[in-house]
Regions:
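Cytosolic juxtamembrane amphipathic/interface segments immediately preceding
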Residues: 9-22
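Hydrophobic alpha-helical transmembrane segments
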Residues: 82-102
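Small-polar-interrupted transmembrane alpha-helices in polytopic inner-membrane proteins
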Residues: 32-40, 96, 109-134
Length: 162
């Protein structure tokens, strides 16, 4: 008899948790996106504030997720952000789009899969040309990687479109 009571209590709590998640799905996704997009920026700030271990842990957390090439990354107070330009633009845009969607979701229609696919074309072209240039040294992307160059703006714009 005690097992049935515990089981039904667990089931009731599980149901309540699922219901809460279904009601607040956008809050959950936006919170995750903001945390994911924000932590890489805290890495150089922690290092600059005298907490090198925390900064390095945050940096290494994102190592498997981004190439982190210094010439393609932002720096704050002389320390590298844990994302490259493209990833920074992409994940910041996702977080901002989620917040804007939360404000305007009653007034906008969902995008079609075709539109989503079209928005991926620029980043696929940009990323594949970078890959080909890096692997084969073709030189057609040799304009440099500094902020303000064509390569920088292509990475930022295509990252934000995703």
């Amino acid at each position: 008899m005690a097992d049935a009571t515990i089981s039904s209590d667990i089931q009731r709590r599980l149901d309540a948790g699922v219901q809460w998640g279904l009601r607040h799905w956008l809050l959950i996704i936006n919170t995750g996106a903001i945390v994911y997009a924000g932590l890489p920026w805290l890495s150089p700030m922690a290092k600059a504030a005298g907490h090198p271990l925390i900064g390095e842990l945050l940096f290494r957390l994102y190592t498997p997720l981004c190439h982190q090439l210094p010439e393609r990354s932002f720096f704050i107070c002389g320390h590298q952000v844990a994302f490259c330009h493209r990833c920074a633009a992409m994940y910041t845009a996702i977080a901002l789009a989620g917040l804007l969607f939360a404000l305007a979701r009653q007034r906008i229609r969902p995008a079609t899969l075709k539109m989503g696919g079209l928005l991926l074309v620029p980043i696929l072209l940009d990323g594949s040309t970078h890959l080909l240039d890096d692997v084969f040294g073709l030189g057609f992307r040799g304009g440099g990687d500094a902020i303000g160059t064509v390569n920088f703006w292509l990475r930022m714009i295509t990252g934000a479109l995703v």
